[in-house]
Amino acid sequence: MADPQTRKPSEMVHRPLSSRKYDYGHLLVVGGSKYYAGAPLLNALAAYIAGVDVVTIAAPHRAADIAVSHSPDIIAYPLSGDVLGTEHLQEINSIIKRNVTAVLIGGGMGREKKSFDFVVELYNAHKNLPFIFDADALHCASRVDFSSKDLLIPNIKEFGLISSSDTPTQVSVKTTAFSIKSNLLVKGPVDYVSDGKRVKEIKDASGKAVYLAKGGTGDILAGVCASLIAQGLTPFDAACIGAAAVKHAGAALGKLHGPFYLPTDLLRVLPDSLVHELGK
């Protein structure tokens, strides 16, 4: 499996003429279930837009089938059953051997005990890889010994699953990141990013990004951050850039349409927002 070199944000837009597929990462998206089938697709589409060379989805068959039927860009491995479980470890381990450089896990996964057991075992089997924990995977985060290569993306409510504080502030987010020895992106009206040493607030001065508070936008944010990590950015840089780009895109749509847009509409404006943030 690949071990991407750490890149600077300034290196992400302009690539060497000698670049080949997989030089800028292979992201594995693991998630989905019978009734929550869209999250892995949103993860994958956002990840491609954010520049990663290859995205592979591993999901229960309904979620995988929906993903490939929606877009020919998607590679999806359909797994048996309605939810993820330890019986899928062998299949996913074989996928990871194919130059995977980061794993995004949790979107639409559901909260079955067997799914949580699967997440913990998968993480423990591949501690050399960056893992991005989002959504339902955060509900078993207390069972995982994270490291500085990982990123957790809780919303305000989910923050309480991993922190002794229910309220995200600069102090509480930095303290929690230090405690779990990893990176946090706490999303909300103000996003907080910390690696335990630094903390940064991501705000929208226009007030128009408020309409991001709808289902699906978090899956897009997770896909962007995971894509940047898979390409070689540090989790802290990836989280700062990803959060700022999605807020920028949300504000652009909000100025034009107010709350009247689909989460997938963010995908149309993300390229300009990413160029804006990566070009700083």
Model-based region annotation:
Residues 1-130, 139-148, 161-280:
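Small-residue (G/A/S/T)-rich helix-start motifs and N-terminal tracts that mark the onset
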